UniProtKB/Swiss-Prot annotation:
Protein name stated in the entry: Phenylalanine--tRNA ligase alpha subunit
A Pfam family of this chain: tRNA-synt_2d
Subcellular compartments: Cytoplasm
CC terms in the record's Gene Ontology section: cytoplasm
Gene (name only): pheS
Record-linked SUPFAM superfamilies: Class II aaRS and biotin synthetases, tRNA-binding arm
PANTHER family xrefs: PHENYLALANINE--TRNA LIGASE, MITOCHONDRIAL, PHENYLALANYL-TRNA SYNTHETASE
Organism encoding this protein: Symbiobacterium thermophilum (strain DSM 24528 / JCM 14929 / IAM 14863 / T)
Length: 343
């Protein structure tokens, strides 16, 4: 038995030394140390030896051989793994002196650029930027803004109701009411602009979308007049479209302002002489404005006998389309990088 054990040891150590990869080492672990290995079979015959001393001696020799084979396997496996790692590192070597690949820098979406520009203009004039929720209650979106039950603007064909009393806001005017009630709480002056997304039940085409943006402004104080409204709108228009642009206010109707006016700017394409864009009028419509209706002031916690205010609203999409000659509002949301990278 001793000769068998020593022969197995020598054979195993020689095979381990000649192993070419880690896979071969794993196979040898099973071959030389597994339950069905030749070594296990030889040691299984210890009980047939004639004396206790022989059984002890052969058992001790068998354990020494197991330990020697295990140590040899572990050492060779570590050696082969290290060699494989070095070979992989050599094959995947990276030249760290090469210049890095350029990374394309991101930039703000064109609408965000326009909205930020509008915010900068009004912040420089002493206004705050106020924002509010896009899912709104009927009262803040309609009732508080002098749009009672039965008004056409409440029609399900125009508004996106989520339930009987909750809808996606149709304008950012809800922010004005919430600011008056939750922030200002009767104090004056109030000078805010309210940018944000709004939603209408509309058919999408080159000039209409179900989701678009608005920027509204609100000023409340004693002695506020249409003259100061026109002054603020003139400053805004000239900051956006150039120092030579003019504005005019045309009588109109909005339920939350009285009197109400549409705001036009002199055509930036023909200088007011008349062209296809302005349809020969020399003027381009931008948005709506007017003096805050007394009912809206009351809903916001103000006494219309003590203070007055004005408000305006227009769409950043409309401004961007005029500034950059964009003809289709859908370009803003189609996520076409060929379009977006131009700005």
């Amino acid at each position: 038995m001793k000769d068998q054990l020593l022969k197995l040891r020598d054979e195993a150590l020689a095979a381990i030394a000649a192993a070419a990869d880690v896979g071969a080492i794993q196979e040898m672990r099973v071959r030389y140390l597994g339950k069905k290995s030749e070594l296990s079979q030889v040691l299984g015959g210890l009980g047939r030896l004639p004396t206790v001393e022989e059984r002890k001696a052969m058992g001790a020799l068998g354990n020494e051989i197991k330990q020697a084979i295990t140590a040899a396997l572990d050492a060779r496996e570590a050696e082969l793994a290290a060699a494989a790692l070095q070979a992989r590192l050599a094959s995947e070597r990276i030249d760290v002196t090469l210049p890095g690949a350029p990374v394309r820098r991101g930039h703000l979406h064109i609408l965000n650029q326009v909205i930020h520009r509008i915010e900068e203009i009004f912040i420089a004039m002493g206004y705050e930027v106020a924002e509010s929720r896009q899912v709104e209650t009927d009262w803040y979106n309609f009732e508080a803004l002098n749009i009672p039950k039965g008004h056409p603007a409440r029609d399900a064909q125009d508004s996106l109701f989520l339930s009987e009393e909750v809808l996606l806001r149709t304008h950012t005017s809800n922010t004005q009411i919430r600011y008056m009630l939750e922030v200002a709480r009767g104090r004056t002056p109030v000078k805010i602009i309210c940018p944000g997304r709004v939603f209408r039940r509309d058919f999408e085409d080159a000039t209409h979308a179900m989701m678009f943006h608005q920027v509204e402004g609100l000023v409340i104080d004693k002695g506020i007049t249409m003259a100061s409204l026109k002054g603020a709108l003139t400053e805004m228009a000239r900051a956006l479209f150039g120092p030579d642009v003019g504005i005019r206010l045309r009588p109109s109707y909005f339920p939350f302002t009285e009197p109400s006016a549409e705001m036009d700017i002199s055509c930036i394409f023909c200088g007011g002489k008349g062209c296809r864009t302005c349809k020969g009028s020399g003027w381009i419509e931008i948005g709506g404005s007017g003096m805050v209706h007394p009912n809206v002031l009351r809903a916001g916690g103000y006494d219309p006998e003590e203070v007055s205010g004005w408000a305006f609203g227009y769409g950043p999409e409309r401004v961007a389309m005029l500034m950059y000659g964009i003809e289709d509002i859908r370009h803003f949301v189609n996520n076409d990088m060929r379009f977006l990278r131009q700005f």
